[in-house]
Amino acid sequence: KVFRRLFEEVVRQCIEKGLVSGRVVGADSTHVRANASRASEELVEVAEEVGVYWERLDDYEEEGLEELERRTGKRRKKRTKQLKRDNRRSHKRVSRTDPEAGHMKRPGKPEGPHYLAHQAVDGDYGIIVGQTVTAGDVNDSVPYLDLMEQIHTNVVPIQSATADAAYDFPLAHRVLGELGIDFFVRPQKTAARVSVQFTRDDFYRDENRDVYLCPGGKELRLKRLARSASGLFWEYQADQRDCALCPLRDKCLREDDKRGARKVSVSYFAADRQRNLERRYSPEYRDALKLRQVWCEGSFSAQKREHNLARILRRGL
Protein backbone atom coordinates (compact mmCIF):
# COMPACT_ATOMS: atom_id res chain seq x y z
CA LYS A 1 0.00 0.00 0.00
CA VAL A 2 2.88 2.36 0.73
CA PHE A 3 4.38 1.84 -2.73
CA ARG A 4 0.93 2.27 -4.29
CA ARG A 5 0.46 5.62 -2.55
CA LEU A 6 3.94 6.74 -3.62
CA PHE A 7 3.19 5.75 -7.20
CA GLU A 8 -0.14 7.59 -7.23
CA GLU A 9 1.44 10.73 -5.76
CA VAL A 10 4.18 10.76 -8.40
CA VAL A 11 1.58 10.38 -11.16
CA ARG A 12 -0.49 13.20 -9.64
CA GLN A 13 2.50 15.52 -9.66
CA CYS A 14 3.26 14.57 -13.28
CA ILE A 15 -0.30 15.53 -14.21
CA GLU A 16 0.07 18.88 -12.44
CA LYS A 17 3.32 19.58 -14.31
CA GLY A 18 1.76 18.77 -17.67
CA LEU A 19 3.71 15.55 -18.23
CA VAL A 20 0.55 13.42 -18.39
CA SER A 21 -2.52 14.36 -20.45
CA GLY A 22 -4.42 11.13 -21.17
CA ARG A 23 -4.46 12.05 -24.86
CA VAL A 24 -3.14 8.58 -25.79
CA VAL A 25 -2.68 5.80 -23.23
CA GLY A 26 -0.99 2.59 -24.36
CA ALA A 27 -1.06 -0.77 -22.62
CA ASP A 28 1.12 -3.85 -22.70
CA SER A 29 2.47 -6.58 -20.43
CA THR A 30 5.77 -8.27 -19.74
CA HIS A 31 6.68 -11.43 -17.89
CA VAL A 32 8.44 -11.55 -14.52
CA ARG A 33 9.99 -14.82 -13.40
CA ALA A 34 8.62 -16.47 -10.30
CA ASN A 35 11.06 -17.67 -7.66
CA ALA A 36 10.17 -21.28 -8.41
CA SER A 37 11.41 -23.91 -10.82
CA ARG A 38 9.50 -25.88 -13.43
CA ALA A 39 10.35 -29.00 -11.42
CA SER A 40 8.08 -27.70 -8.65
CA GLU A 41 5.05 -27.69 -10.94
CA GLU A 42 2.39 -30.37 -10.92
CA LEU A 43 -0.79 -30.85 -12.91
CA VAL A 44 -3.83 -30.26 -10.73
CA GLU A 45 -7.56 -30.08 -11.33
CA VAL A 46 -9.08 -26.71 -10.47
CA ALA A 47 -12.57 -25.26 -10.57
CA GLU A 48 -13.04 -22.53 -13.16
CA GLU A 49 -14.08 -19.39 -11.31
CA VAL A 50 -16.55 -16.89 -12.73
CA GLY A 51 -14.33 -13.96 -13.66
CA VAL A 52 -14.92 -10.24 -14.03
CA TYR A 53 -15.28 -10.67 -17.79
CA TRP A 54 -18.20 -13.02 -17.22
CA GLU A 55 -19.83 -10.60 -14.80
CA ARG A 56 -19.57 -7.79 -17.33
CA LEU A 57 -21.49 -9.84 -19.87
CA ASP A 58 -24.55 -10.12 -17.60
CA ASP A 59 -25.88 -6.63 -18.36
CA TYR A 60 -25.10 -6.91 -22.05
CA GLU A 61 -26.87 -10.27 -22.24
CA GLU A 62 -30.05 -8.79 -20.81
CA GLU A 63 -29.77 -5.91 -23.27
CA GLY A 64 -29.25 -8.39 -26.10
CA LEU A 65 -32.26 -10.49 -25.09
CA GLU A 66 -34.47 -7.41 -25.29
CA GLU A 67 -33.07 -6.61 -28.73
CA LEU A 68 -33.63 -10.22 -29.81
CA GLU A 69 -37.27 -9.91 -28.83
CA ARG A 70 -37.64 -6.72 -30.86
CA ARG A 71 -36.00 -8.24 -33.93
CA THR A 72 -37.57 -11.70 -33.92
CA GLY A 73 -40.46 -11.61 -31.47
CA LYS A 74 -38.74 -14.42 -29.56
CA ARG A 75 -37.06 -14.37 -26.20
CA ARG A 76 -35.14 -17.27 -24.74
CA LYS A 77 -34.83 -17.75 -21.02
CA LYS A 78 -31.70 -16.27 -19.59
CA ARG A 79 -29.27 -19.03 -18.71
CA THR A 80 -26.53 -17.01 -17.05
CA LYS A 81 -27.30 -18.26 -13.55
CA GLN A 82 -27.45 -21.82 -14.77
CA LEU A 83 -24.02 -21.52 -16.35
CA LYS A 84 -22.61 -19.99 -13.18
CA ARG A 85 -23.76 -23.03 -11.24
CA ASP A 86 -21.93 -25.37 -13.58
CA ASN A 87 -18.94 -26.75 -11.72
CA ARG A 88 -16.68 -26.69 -14.73
CA ARG A 89 -13.18 -27.88 -13.97
CA SER A 90 -9.92 -27.82 -15.87
CA HIS A 91 -6.33 -28.92 -15.41
CA LYS A 92 -3.46 -26.49 -15.00
CA ARG A 93 0.15 -26.53 -13.89
CA VAL A 94 0.62 -25.17 -10.38
CA SER A 95 3.92 -24.67 -8.58
CA ARG A 96 4.16 -26.20 -5.12
CA THR A 97 6.74 -23.54 -4.23
CA ASP A 98 4.63 -20.60 -5.41
CA PRO A 99 0.99 -21.52 -6.07
CA GLU A 100 0.10 -17.93 -7.01
CA ALA A 101 2.41 -17.99 -10.04
CA GLY A 102 1.03 -19.16 -13.38
CA HIS A 103 2.59 -21.48 -15.94
CA MET A 104 3.38 -19.25 -18.91
CA LYS A 105 3.66 -20.78 -22.35
CA ARG A 106 3.76 -18.24 -25.16
CA PRO A 107 5.57 -18.21 -28.51
CA GLY A 108 9.01 -16.67 -28.15
CA LYS A 109 8.78 -16.46 -24.35
CA PRO A 110 10.39 -18.58 -21.63
CA GLU A 111 8.16 -21.35 -20.32
CA GLY A 112 7.53 -21.97 -16.66
CA PRO A 113 6.10 -20.27 -13.54
CA HIS A 114 5.83 -16.52 -14.12
CA TYR A 115 3.89 -13.40 -13.31
CA LEU A 116 2.70 -10.77 -15.77
CA ALA A 117 3.15 -7.05 -15.14
CA HIS A 118 0.44 -5.13 -17.00
CA GLN A 119 1.23 -1.44 -17.48
CA ALA A 120 -0.52 1.57 -18.98
CA VAL A 121 1.73 4.37 -20.25
CA ASP A 122 0.78 7.93 -21.20
CA GLY A 123 1.88 8.73 -24.74
CA ASP A 124 3.17 12.26 -24.11
CA TYR A 125 6.33 11.52 -22.12
CA GLY A 126 6.11 7.80 -21.36
CA ILE A 127 4.92 8.17 -17.76
CA ILE A 128 3.43 4.97 -16.31
CA VAL A 129 -0.09 5.84 -15.11
CA GLY A 130 -1.38 2.41 -14.11
CA GLN A 131 -0.16 -1.07 -13.29
CA THR A 132 -1.49 -4.40 -12.14
CA VAL A 133 0.01 -7.88 -11.76
CA THR A 134 -1.50 -11.26 -12.59
CA ALA A 135 -0.33 -14.85 -12.74
CA GLY A 136 1.60 -15.75 -15.87
CA ASP A 137 -1.16 -17.89 -17.36
CA VAL A 138 -3.69 -15.04 -17.46
CA ASN A 139 -4.57 -13.58 -20.84
CA ASP A 140 -3.56 -9.94 -21.36
CA SER A 141 -7.16 -8.99 -22.05
CA VAL A 142 -8.45 -10.11 -18.63
CA PRO A 143 -7.27 -7.17 -16.44
CA TYR A 144 -7.31 -4.60 -19.26
CA LEU A 145 -10.75 -3.05 -18.89
CA ASP A 146 -10.55 -2.76 -15.10
CA LEU A 147 -7.14 -1.10 -15.43
CA MET A 148 -8.34 1.41 -18.02
CA GLU A 149 -11.51 2.24 -16.08
CA GLN A 150 -9.49 2.80 -12.91
CA ILE A 151 -7.15 5.20 -14.71
CA HIS A 152 -10.00 6.99 -16.50
CA THR A 153 -11.98 7.47 -13.28
CA ASN A 154 -9.28 8.03 -10.64
CA VAL A 155 -6.10 9.18 -12.40
CA VAL A 156 -6.63 11.10 -15.64
CA PRO A 157 -9.49 11.14 -18.18
CA ILE A 158 -8.39 9.03 -21.13
CA GLN A 159 -9.12 10.43 -24.58
CA SER A 160 -7.82 7.45 -26.56
CA ALA A 161 -6.37 4.03 -25.79
CA THR A 162 -3.98 2.00 -27.90
CA ALA A 163 -2.83 -1.61 -27.62
CA ASP A 164 -1.47 -4.53 -29.62
CA ALA A 165 -3.48 -7.38 -31.10
CA ALA A 166 -3.75 -9.27 -27.79
CA TYR A 167 -6.25 -6.63 -26.64
CA ASP A 168 -8.44 -6.74 -29.75
CA PHE A 169 -11.43 -8.47 -28.18
CA PRO A 170 -15.01 -7.34 -28.95
CA LEU A 171 -16.06 -6.36 -25.42
CA ALA A 172 -13.18 -3.85 -25.17
CA HIS A 173 -14.50 -1.93 -28.17
CA ARG A 174 -17.94 -1.61 -26.56
CA VAL A 175 -16.81 -0.71 -23.02
CA LEU A 176 -14.22 1.86 -24.08
CA GLY A 177 -16.68 3.37 -26.54
CA GLU A 178 -19.25 3.81 -23.77
CA LEU A 179 -16.59 5.61 -21.73
CA GLY A 180 -15.98 7.99 -24.64
CA ILE A 181 -12.50 6.58 -25.27
CA ASP A 182 -11.27 6.11 -28.84
CA PHE A 183 -9.69 2.67 -29.23
CA PHE A 184 -6.72 2.24 -31.55
CA VAL A 185 -5.78 -1.43 -31.53
CA ARG A 186 -3.81 -3.60 -33.90
CA PRO A 187 -6.37 -5.95 -35.50
CA GLN A 188 -6.14 -9.55 -34.40
CA LYS A 189 -5.78 -12.12 -37.14
CA THR A 190 -8.70 -14.50 -37.02
CA ALA A 191 -8.49 -18.05 -38.29
CA ALA A 192 -11.50 -19.87 -39.68
CA ARG A 193 -13.00 -22.16 -37.03
CA VAL A 194 -14.84 -24.41 -39.43
CA SER A 195 -13.58 -27.61 -41.01
CA VAL A 196 -15.47 -27.10 -44.28
CA GLN A 197 -14.68 -25.03 -47.35
CA PHE A 198 -17.17 -22.19 -46.84
CA THR A 199 -16.28 -19.83 -43.97
CA ARG A 200 -18.28 -16.91 -42.60
CA ASP A 201 -16.60 -14.61 -45.13
CA ASP A 202 -18.41 -16.50 -47.89
CA PHE A 203 -21.78 -15.42 -46.50
CA TYR A 204 -23.19 -12.05 -47.57
CA ARG A 205 -24.72 -9.82 -44.92
CA ASP A 206 -28.00 -8.13 -45.93
CA GLU A 207 -28.44 -5.36 -43.36
CA ASN A 208 -31.87 -4.27 -44.60
CA ARG A 209 -33.43 -7.70 -44.13
CA ASP A 210 -31.24 -8.72 -41.16
CA VAL A 211 -30.19 -11.98 -42.80
CA TYR A 212 -27.10 -13.68 -44.17
CA LEU A 213 -27.12 -15.11 -47.68
CA CYS A 214 -25.18 -18.31 -48.27
CA PRO A 215 -23.20 -19.05 -51.47
CA GLY A 216 -26.29 -20.91 -52.70
CA GLY A 217 -28.48 -17.81 -52.28
CA LYS A 218 -30.51 -19.09 -49.30
CA GLU A 219 -31.23 -17.03 -46.21
CA LEU A 220 -29.84 -17.58 -42.73
CA ARG A 221 -32.17 -15.88 -40.24
CA LEU A 222 -31.48 -14.70 -36.72
CA LYS A 223 -32.33 -17.51 -34.30
CA ARG A 224 -30.94 -16.67 -30.90
CA LEU A 225 -28.41 -14.89 -28.71
CA ALA A 226 -25.79 -17.40 -27.61
CA ARG A 227 -23.41 -17.04 -24.71
CA SER A 228 -20.15 -18.82 -24.08
CA ALA A 229 -17.07 -18.29 -21.94
CA SER A 230 -15.65 -16.05 -24.68
CA GLY A 231 -18.60 -13.71 -25.15
CA LEU A 232 -22.03 -13.07 -26.63
CA PHE A 233 -22.96 -14.03 -30.18
CA TRP A 234 -25.86 -13.61 -32.57
CA GLU A 235 -26.61 -16.94 -34.22
CA TYR A 236 -28.03 -17.02 -37.73
CA GLN A 237 -29.23 -20.36 -39.06
CA ALA A 238 -30.42 -21.68 -42.41
CA ASP A 239 -33.54 -23.74 -42.95
CA GLN A 240 -32.86 -27.47 -42.73
CA ARG A 241 -34.89 -28.08 -45.88
CA ASP A 242 -32.73 -25.66 -47.86
CA CYS A 243 -29.53 -27.34 -46.68
CA ALA A 244 -30.86 -30.84 -47.33
CA LEU A 245 -31.40 -30.11 -51.02
CA CYS A 246 -28.41 -27.82 -51.55
CA PRO A 247 -25.84 -28.99 -54.17
CA LEU A 248 -23.12 -27.18 -52.15
CA ARG A 249 -23.91 -29.05 -48.93
CA ASP A 250 -20.60 -30.96 -48.83
CA LYS A 251 -18.70 -27.65 -48.91
CA CYS A 252 -20.79 -26.11 -46.16
CA LEU A 253 -21.65 -28.84 -43.64
CA ARG A 254 -19.77 -31.75 -42.12
CA GLU A 255 -21.21 -35.20 -42.67
CA ASP A 256 -21.74 -35.63 -38.91
CA ASP A 257 -23.46 -32.24 -38.44
CA LYS A 258 -26.47 -33.04 -36.25
CA ARG A 259 -28.27 -29.76 -36.93
CA GLY A 260 -28.46 -30.40 -40.65
CA ALA A 261 -28.41 -26.65 -41.23
CA ARG A 262 -25.57 -24.14 -41.53
CA LYS A 263 -25.07 -21.69 -38.70
CA VAL A 264 -23.18 -18.37 -38.68
CA SER A 265 -22.15 -16.76 -35.38
CA VAL A 266 -21.41 -13.04 -35.09
CA SER A 267 -20.15 -11.25 -31.99
CA TYR A 268 -22.78 -9.14 -30.24
CA PHE A 269 -20.18 -6.35 -30.21
CA ALA A 270 -19.14 -6.77 -33.85
CA ALA A 271 -20.50 -3.36 -34.88
CA ASP A 272 -18.41 -1.60 -32.21
CA ARG A 273 -15.27 -3.39 -33.35
CA GLN A 274 -15.95 -2.72 -37.01
CA ARG A 275 -16.55 0.97 -36.32
CA ASN A 276 -13.12 1.29 -34.72
CA LEU A 277 -11.22 -0.82 -37.24
CA GLU A 278 -12.62 1.14 -40.18
CA ARG A 279 -10.19 3.91 -39.17
CA ARG A 280 -7.14 1.67 -38.97
CA TYR A 281 -5.52 3.23 -42.05
CA SER A 282 -5.95 6.82 -40.86
CA PRO A 283 -2.86 8.82 -39.77
CA GLU A 284 -4.29 9.22 -36.24
CA TYR A 285 -4.72 5.45 -35.86
CA ARG A 286 -1.23 4.68 -37.14
CA ASP A 287 0.36 7.36 -34.96
CA ALA A 288 -1.32 5.93 -31.86
CA LEU A 289 0.03 2.44 -32.61
CA LYS A 290 3.52 3.88 -33.08
CA LEU A 291 3.30 5.71 -29.75
CA ARG A 292 2.36 2.46 -28.02
CA GLN A 293 5.33 0.69 -29.54
CA VAL A 294 7.74 3.46 -28.60
CA TRP A 295 6.59 4.11 -25.05
CA CYS A 296 5.19 0.77 -23.83
CA GLU A 297 7.87 -1.47 -25.27
CA GLY A 298 10.51 1.17 -24.59
CA SER A 299 9.43 1.45 -20.97
CA PHE A 300 9.70 -2.30 -20.42
CA SER A 301 13.08 -2.30 -22.14
CA ALA A 302 14.36 0.42 -19.80
CA GLN A 303 12.99 -1.39 -16.75
CA LYS A 304 14.72 -4.60 -17.75
CA ARG A 305 18.00 -2.92 -18.64
CA GLU A 306 18.26 -0.30 -15.89
CA HIS A 307 16.05 -1.56 -13.06
CA ASN A 308 16.78 -5.30 -12.95
CA LEU A 309 13.31 -6.37 -14.14
CA ALA A 310 14.86 -9.00 -16.41
CA ARG A 311 16.63 -10.73 -13.51
CA ILE A 312 14.32 -10.19 -10.59
CA LEU A 313 12.52 -13.20 -9.08
CA ARG A 314 9.13 -12.81 -7.45
CA ARG A 315 7.20 -15.04 -5.08
CA GLY A 316 3.52 -14.35 -4.41
CA LEU A 317 1.22 -11.66 -5.71
What name fits each language-model region?
Residues 1-317:
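Anion-binding and metal-coordination hotspots
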